[in-house]
């Protein structure tokens, strides 16, 4: 008995000594001492010991000296090296949002399993997390947006620390899968691509380049053109002017040495333009203030030489920074903002806007420009306040086909943000545009204020931004894209919801880098924007386009979903945890369906045919791979990678009699 007591005593002594040794050797490692810049987040930059806005971290009235300030959606990967014993933190929205309507949910994954999640936290609320990490090798800190979207989601991991016995943790870059090109190469035989319908106002200049692929040279023809329009058989450019009101069924034909392609193309001469979402390129996401005449010409050249124009991409849009910048000492952008007649001047980077416009038009492409209803643009260049009529006339004189009208400094003019004040500047410019003998697509950019999707068309908008600016992160792109649910009833031919430009390829707002979206995320991006019937505006430097990016942007079956003549925006038909299914009816009676996995890891996504309102066993086609997959029965189920998509087309099959 005494020997047993001695053994127990010895074991307890050994255990206590071991615990003492571990306690003595354990370190406290603050999360903020690690490289938190490896975090990926939806807005702003991550900060150590500061909020996302760079202020001292403060949650629910308590200020914290240590912590990690970020913005939902946010993800930070941490290699624990198997030596971490525990983690704890206070979490919540930073008080710097001053009671604004943000809300977030915090989550922690340990070795690919969800280990903890908070309730939805709003301004003034906080909670504490404490986790045992014994044996855990990898940890992921997540902050998710909730149903109210990403605005004001300034999230803090306050006093976040690890207890570690051994090597210290280190943050790591998020995993990134290899690029896989899914789009098949275009056939050498001729194929006509892009939109099947086009709207023009009576008497307005008409310009349309038939998008077609196939071995060059191609020969183009168009039978049934309305009076006043002609086609160049060598370039496929249809031009002229017509007042022949009505719908004109035109048969387009493209031939080469290998065959012939035909397609019906409807020209609608009436009071509505932008019958399909505009497709093209915008300068801001790659060049920002560095934009100039030569870069615009190079973009037009690249749209042709790359072959993207053969898939329907048509607009070359100049964003901010083309006008005079008041008070600047840079001679390239300083000078007289307007001439003696009040007409706006371009700066020296754009020496001849009419010549630039003519150059773009000579290729069968269209050109766009940018302004603001306030005195200054967002980058402090001259804008249209009190000169709306002058500027609309100047834009038409220059030959512009598209106007992005950005709220910017008008926030200092508006008395408040009631509906009348929000609509007023856009009505004013719309009236001015309507007096021009030129069709100018009118793009409202005011970040969704006042639920612009409910009234954008009433003030003359052809499209309207529904959110703030997009960035090339999963958190930004997915938050904006999936946040379009419920807005579908406000979109249609001539008036489109706009979730912002595409962030694939070389982007960077002046400092170019490859998109931070993973390959799977980029497929999700293009698939979702196509289902949403969104304007598609490329934001990358097209002179540096790689094969992966080109193939993302040149899949004709994906583009046809976006450009479908019905103009129906996809509807969210399923949203469960991190799985979503969206469906878009198409003109030919088929249904485009996107099955999305928003989760951190590969998972199965299923949807029943009943939920899709489909009877029978429809034919299934993989749209990206352009491959038939047989027939569906009862439901669709696919294993989809993290942040990935399966984009399919379901076509009813007629029963044989």
What are these regions (language model features)?
Residues 24-182:
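Gly-Asp-aromatic-enriched flexible segments
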Residues 190-215:
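Solvent-exposed, low-complexity, repeat-rich "mucin-like" stalks and linkers
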Residues 210, 246-258:
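A short beta-strand micro-motif common to beta-rich folds, especially ectodomain repeats
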Residues 228-244:
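Strand-loop-strand motifs at the edges of beta-sheets in extracellular beta-sandwich domains
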Residues 285, 299, 303-418:
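Aromatic-lined carbohydrate-binding/catalytic grooves of carbohydrate-active enzymes
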Residues 390, 438-541, 562:
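Glycan-recognition surfaces
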Residues 523, 529-532, 537-539, 575-614, ...:
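Carbohydrate-binding surface patches
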Residues 631-657:
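C-terminal beta-strand-rich structural cap/linker in extracellular carbohydrate-active enzymes
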């Amino acid at each position: 008995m005494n020997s047993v007591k001695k053994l127990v005593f010895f074991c307890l002594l050994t255990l206590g000594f071991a615990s003492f040794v571990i306690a003595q050797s354990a370190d406290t490692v603050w999360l903020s001492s690690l490289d938190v810049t490896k975090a990926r987040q939806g807005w702003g930059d991550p900060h150590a010991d500061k909020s996302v806005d760079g202020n001292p971290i403060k949650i629910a009235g308590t200020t914290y000296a240590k912590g990690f300030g970020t913005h939902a959606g946010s993800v930070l990967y941490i290699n624990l090296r198997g030596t971490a014993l525990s983690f704890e933190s206070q979490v919540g929205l930073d008080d710097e949002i001053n009671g604004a309507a943000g809300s977030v949910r915090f989550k922690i994954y340990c070795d690919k399993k969800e280990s903890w999640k908070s309730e939805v936290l709003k301004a003034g609320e906080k909670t504490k997390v404490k986790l045992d990490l014994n044996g855990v090798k990898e940890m992921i800190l997540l902050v998710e947006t909730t149903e109210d979207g990403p605005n004001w989601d300034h999230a803090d991991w306050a006093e976040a620390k690890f207890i570690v016995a051994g090597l210290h943790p280190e943050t790591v870059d998020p995993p990134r899968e290899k690029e896989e090109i899914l789009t098949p190469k275009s056939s050498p035989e001729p194929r006509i691509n892009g939109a099947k319908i086009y709207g023009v106002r009576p008497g307005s200049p008409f310009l349309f380049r038939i998008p077609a692929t196939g071995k060059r040279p191609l020969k183009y023809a168009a039978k049934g053109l309305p009076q006043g329009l002609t086609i160049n058989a060598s370039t496929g450019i249809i031009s002229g002017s017509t007042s022949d009101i009505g719908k004109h069924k035109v048969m387009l034909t493209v031939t080469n040495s290998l065959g012939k392609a035909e397609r019906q193309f409807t020209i609608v001469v009436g009071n509505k333009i932008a019958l399909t979402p505009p497709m093209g390129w915008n300068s801001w996401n790659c060049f920002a203030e560095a934009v100039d005449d030569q870069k615009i010409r190079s973009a037009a050249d690249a749209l042709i030489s790359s072959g993207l124009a053969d898939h329907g991409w048509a607009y070359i849009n100049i964003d901010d920074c083309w006008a005079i910048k008041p008070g600047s000492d840079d001679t390239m952008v300083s000078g007289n903002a307007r001439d003696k007649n009040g007409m706006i001047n371009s700066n020296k980077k754009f020496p001849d806007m009419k010549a630039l416009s003519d150059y773009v038009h000579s290729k069968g492409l269209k050109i766009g420009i940018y302004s603001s209803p306030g005195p200054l643009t967002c980058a402090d260049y001259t804008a249209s306040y009190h000169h709306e009529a002058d500027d609309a006339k100047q834009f038409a004189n220059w030959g512009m086909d598209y106007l992005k009208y950005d709220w910017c400094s008008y926030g200092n003019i508006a008395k408040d943000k009631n509906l009348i004040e929000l609509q007023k500047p856009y009505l004013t410019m719309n009236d001015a545009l309507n007096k021009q003998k030129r069709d100018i697509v009118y793009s409202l950019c005011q970040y969704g204020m006042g639920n612009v999707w409910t009234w954008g068309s009433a003030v003359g908008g052809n499209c309207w931004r529904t959110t703030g600016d997009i960035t090339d992160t999963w958190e930004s792109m997915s938050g904006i894209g999936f946040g379009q649910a419920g807005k579908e009833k406000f979109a249609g031919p001539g008036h489109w919801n706009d979730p912002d430009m595409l962030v694939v390829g070389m982007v960077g707002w002046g400092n170019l880098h490859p998109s931070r979206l993973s390959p799977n995320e980029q497929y999700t991006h293009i698939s979702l924007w196509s289902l949403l019937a969104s304007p598609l505006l490329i934001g990358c430097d097209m002179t540096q386009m790689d094969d992966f990016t080109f193939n993302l942007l040149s899949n004709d079956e994906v583009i046809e979903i976006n450009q479908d003549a019905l103009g129906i925006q996809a509807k969210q038909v399923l949203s469960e945890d991190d799985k979503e299914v969206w469906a878009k009816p198409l003109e030919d009676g088929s249904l485009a369906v996107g099955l999305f996995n928003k989760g951190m890891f590969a998972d199965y996504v299923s949807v029943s045919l009943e939920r899709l309102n489909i009877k029978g066993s429809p034919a299934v086609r993989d749209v990206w791979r352009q491959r038939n997959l047989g027939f569906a029965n009862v439901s669709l189920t696919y294993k989809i990678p993290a942040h990935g998509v399966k984009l399919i087309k379901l076509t009813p099959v007629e029963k044989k009699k």
